[in-house]
Structures are given as structure tokens and as C-alpha cells.
Amino acid sequence: MRVVILGSGVVGVASAYYLARAGHEVTVIDREAGPALDTSFANAGQISPGYAAPWAAPGVPLKAVKWMFEKHAPLAIRLDGTRFQLQWMWQMLRNCTTERYALNKGRMVRLAEYSRDCLQALRAETAIQYEGRTGGTLQVFRTQQQLDGAAKDIAVLREANVPFELLSSDELKKAEPALAAVSHKLTGGLRLPGDETGDCQLFTTRLAALAEQLGVKFRFNTRIDALAVAGGKIAGVQCGGEMVRADAYVVALGSYSTNLVASLVKIPVYPLKGYSITAPIVDAAKAPVSTVLDETYKIAITRFDDRIRVGGMAEIVGFDKRLRDARRGTLEMCVNDLFPGGGDTAKATFWTGLRPMTPDGTPIVGRTPVPNLFLNTGHGTLGWTMSCGSGQLLADLMSGKKPVIRADDLSVHRYLSETDGEHRPAYA
């Protein structure tokens, strides 16, 4: 089958790789000059299945009000003037219950754990290198309330059989020796030894090269204008003056997926703006070993070979990609507070990206009401964590195979309701 994939981020490239492995003829189209040059370019660098959790959580609405008045708040909201933003935020609020949080986190962990298994198999088969580390991830708490609040996450981890370690403040240095100097600031931590880290952009670039060896064709610097429809199916992709045709089409354009498919299916994928800095390491003994997640500021600090990546925060501001110095200040504050002297933040590069977020945190992977149109989008802050599993799952669905994990609750159909013959997001 001839397949066109729109988008060459980590999710699009992973989709291409697994579809090509399944024997399909794949073409990837993207407006950028190469793979992973947008949202996948400088993310936090973590592969964290156990920490897969929706931003929509109990207590978040009240926290959001408090964060409005804090200098280093992890969440900021600015109205963009669209009805879609208001609808999206309302649906996110409806997912901030204990019951829905557990449901959403459970299926996110299911996909993320499967994806990590797929990545490990890929690494064993291809020996792909991307400055990866397998030292686990450590979530650190600054208050007793945060430590006590980890109980709801631990319950989900137990149910999913995910290994974990609950550490006291004195025990944190066993996982991250450099934290010994600041352990008095922390109340404890939750460590997931099975998590991994690495450079997502490097991984995606090298996976694209492996995909090319399987016959995948990449068309970069190509504008994607519209999907052409005929007879109730996709007839092609309008790229400037050219119509690119195939048997099936996969939209993996992250936050830009929503507008492209709007006339065909309404998907609640909204851009969640995040930031990162990447600093050179100046003292390895004072730098992290793997990834450390600061629960207070919702910031991840990740060790690469000779660099530290610090990423996080969330702004609900539409497609605004302006770099804000105050956000850089927050990232620098966090890494210098936990790992003083580890990296040279004065020489750090500063970046922002738009994560494609659904209101319930779970991505949209699979079929749509349009017979030959498939989606692989909405992974939020977990694009790399879920990329290999999402790509393999999609390849199975498109090849007529039964996926290894449950997939029905990952498709767009969980959002659709029939109203006057139209498919609309189910906001009720």
C-alpha cells in the first residue's frame, strides 16, 4: 500500500519506519528542511513511561489560579481569541477529576510502556545511537504535600506493574549523587528505574536514515496546503501546485494537525507552548546522571553526553512562538538550584516549541471516519516517549493486524459524537 505521512517529527518518522518495515511504500512530507526541526528539536530528552500523566489532574484548577500570581509558575494562560481555545480548556477542566485522571493516566502509561518496549527492540536490532542513557528518572518533591500526593500515581504504577522506588531526601543521592548538596531543600522523590533519556532530535534524524534504507522517501521543504477529498475519501495532498496521491494518508503534524483536518473531523489538539535551554557541562560531578523532574516547577533536567537539557512549563497561548526571557530565567533558576555549578547556563541555547495536547492527555492514534485517513498526533509532552509504540500500533492497524496493546480508546472516536450527521468533539 502507498502511504503518505504528513510530518517529520519523531512521531511521523517513527510511523514511517514501522510502516516501511511492514512492507508499505511510504513518502514523508514536511515543510521543514529536515527531520525533527520543530517540536521534536529540543524537548526535555526523557523517555518516561511511568511519569506519563495528563496535565488535567485533581487540584490543577485551583493551582492554576495560584500560579497566575507566581513568578516561576509552570502554567500560564493567555486568551487567543478563539472559541476553540475556550472549548479545549473547558474539556480539560472536565478531566480534572480523580476518576478521569486515573483513567487517562492508565491508558497513557499503557501506550508509553509499550513504546519503551518497542524502542528497546529497535535499539537491539539497529544499534541506533542518540546519546541515550538507561539510568531511570527521578521526580523530586520540595514539600510534604507533594510527597503525600504521589500516592495516586503510585497506585497507577502498581496496577500497571511499573517498577518504582519511593526515596527519602537522604536517599536521593543514591540515584543522583549531585543532589547530596541540596537534599535539605527536598522532602523525597519517586524514582522509576526503567525510564530512559536521550537526544530526541538526534534519534529522529538517525531513525529517518534507517527508514530511508527501508525505502522511505522524504520530501522536505514542501508546503502542505490541503487534503483533497473525492468520493468520501482522501484523493491527495495539495502541496503548492502539485497533488501528491497515495492509498492512505497519515496526519502526524502535531499542533498543526487540527486545522488541516478540520473540514473532515474535529480533533481537540491544541498547542501547549514549552521552553528549554541546553547548557554545556562544566563539572560532571555536579551535573545530573539521568533525568530529574522538579515537581514544583514542572521542569525536567536531563543529562546528555556533555550537555544538560532543561525543559518544561506550559503556556496555553495559541501559536505564539516568541521566546520570553522570564521563562529562560525560570529554567536557569531551577537547574542552578538543584545542580549548582553543573552547567554553564550563561552559554545555554534557548528554544521554544508547541506540544500538541489533547484535553485528556492521551494522543489520538488510529483510524478516522474518513476511510483512508489516519491520525498520529496529540502526544503532548510525551511525543518521544510514545513515538515508537504509536508508530508500531499505527502500522499494525493499517496492515490489518491486531495490535499488541488495546487501541480502541486511543483513536479519535473517543471524542466524536453524532450530531446532525456531523462529527464533533464530545464536550459533554
UniProtKB/Swiss-Prot annotation:
Q: What are the recorded Gene Ontology BP terms?
A: D-alanine catabolic process
**Gene Ontology cellular component terms for the protein in this record:** cytoplasm; plasma membrane
Instruction: Write the Enzyme Commission number(s) for this entry.
Output: 1.4.99.-
The identity of this protein, by name, is: D-amino acid dehydrogenase
Biological pathway? Amino-acid degradation; D-alanine degradation; NH(3) and pyruvate from D-alanine: step 1/1
Q: Which residues bind FAD?
A: 3-17
Q: Which cofactor does it need?
A: FAD
Pfam families named in the record: DAO
The alphabetized UniProt keywords are:
FAD, Flavoprotein, Oxidoreductase
